[in-house]
């Protein structure tokens, strides 16, 4: 984790340096500025919190500076400080409405801050602009999470027309364990869950099966399909042995 954090902050430092050299700053950065010296030192040591403090001082002293304000957005995201990240992402996106990275970080922050409706609005806008299948997947997650099921199915139908490459993958949690599968399989699984909750169970089963055709080890889809089969098997038994007819799939992807 420490190596990843250092790598991420070094990447940010290089991005800032390149942007500054290309003349994109609105307030020129001085290499001798004490706040930037602390920032650079913090970056090299992987000390993200100190880097954030240094940049806040620098931006406060120097006024608007596009490069370092954008960097604050990324650093706050790295720290998981979603209130602060949203503040800067929202501020910057008002000045740069076509910056999809800022828009995406706004949506992520809103999701983390338990504001799913607002996050959905952001990801709807983002997906309409980018047609990025990862943005569609996140939108489906959010829509399913607050039971906007018809919208979730509609998003699934739209994104499934796109071309998916084998390198499009995603991670997921099963209890304490983490798995990895194809992004398309994950989309099929959420699509199946939405169909199940809409009482379109035959179609839901087909989507879980489609996910498993892509990845037979995908545990979420496997558990959902097994739960459906168990419910179907129970429906044919004497009434005393029947499970609850409204029982949902065993595993839901939130």
Which residues does each predicted region cover?
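Canonical tetratricopeptide repeat
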Residues: 71, 105, 138-139, 183, ...
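Terminal, low-structured helical/coil segments at or just beyond the last alpha-helical repeat
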Residues: 23-24, 178-254
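Residue-level recognition of tetratricopeptide repeat
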Residues: 40, 74, 108, 141-142, ...
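N-terminal leader/linker segments that initiate helical-solenoid repeat arrays
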Residues: 18-71, 252-254
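Canonical positions in the second alpha-helix
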Residues: 57-58, 91-92, 125-126, 159, ...
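Register position in tetratricopeptide repeats
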Residues: 44-45, 78-79, 112-113, 145-146, ...
